[in-house]
Amino acid sequence: MDINKPGWNQSDQQATAYDPNQQQYYGDGSTYYDPDQAVDPNQAYYPDPNTYPDAAAYYGYGQDGQAYPQDYAQDPNQAYYADPNAYQDPNAYTDPNAYVDPNAYQDPNAYVDPNNYTDPNAYYGYGQDGQAYPQDYAQDPNQAYYAYVDPNAYQDPNAYTDPYYVTSTDHNAYYGQVDNVPALEASDLAYEVTPQEQAAEQELFSEPETKVIREIHEFPFEKIRSYFQTDFDSYNSRLTQLKDKLDNAIFSMRKAIDTVKENSANLQIMKQNFERQLKEQQTQRLTSNTDAEKIGAKINQLEERMQRLSRTMESVEWTKKEPRQEQFDPRFVDPRNFNNYVNNTDTMMSMFEKVLMMNLLRSTTPVQPPVQYFTPQPLTASPRPVYEEPISASFRRRGYRGDEFYE
């Protein structure tokens, strides 16, 4: 959006005073507003809850100089964290399908609700398809093996039980056993074989591949020969086809050369005829001397005009570097000037305009960008930087402690 808009704007259809000391932007596309009045430094820091929320929340400036709302990077002049005393509506709706930016900044010091904590390092297994998925039925082997089961919970006698999903009250039972009774074989998904384990298994238990060692007379020479023979045959046929094509091409080229020779001979004869006719006409022309003088004067006059025109064209030539397609409304085109807008042709009028424009360009400076004014904002305390200890993979630099190092 252009920040150098004049006061009167066609889309607004209303006059607004243009104050160069203010940055004026479009809010909803229809009215101006002033973002500098968004924060009054003399007011309390949090907005008055009884007022309508400010439509001109903090705006940042993009690479292209456009203003856009930075909801995700808050105003650095505001307090860094949200107001801890702000009222939280317990019944507020949270969209479970809302998009979560995986690259969003996570504050390491953010408060974690102990009743709503999900461990990001929870144990994940890999399925047959290589996808990671939470293994609720085969829990982290480093944890207690079974989750706590309430013995007094109501058991539905008709409920479907998955034979692979073993829930046992016996916490010492093996997986796949209920109260030490062998159950059905556990599913493949209950455990995973790592590639290292697979490799070790291969090394320990696999047998070497049997290699058939042939005697020399057992090799199928005839098969090999016939296999290559088919190749040679196909190449041979393709080469003969190519040769035929080339022969045809040479023949047609020779024909073409002959016809060209014939035509050039005919043209030579025609040229001689024309020259003869021209000489005959010249002898008939310019009977009197005055005609020649008149024609000479006319030629001189034309030459002068050509020189003058060529000088003008040289000074104008830079305008024709890139022919551009003019965008114009035919209703507003001056009919006398119409040729300027068609095909980029040069009329006397357009040439006159170009020379005028050049003189104007010589006598004026280019448009300067407007000055930008910034209103000062009060600075608030920013979080103190944390310096990490540098990693030094080296000897200790301050002498040797005791006799633990000998040169």
Swiss-Prot record:
Keywords: Cell membrane, Membrane, Repeat. It is found in: Cell membrane. Residues 40-174 are annotated as: 12 X 5 AA repeats of D-P-N-Q-A-Y. The N-terminus is blocked. Signal peptide: none annotated. It is a peripheral membrane protein. Residues 1-50 are annotated as: Disordered. This is Proline-rich P65 protein. It comes from Mycoplasmoides pneumoniae (strain ATCC 15531 / DSM 23978 / CIP 103766 / NBRC 14401 / NCTC 10119 / FH).
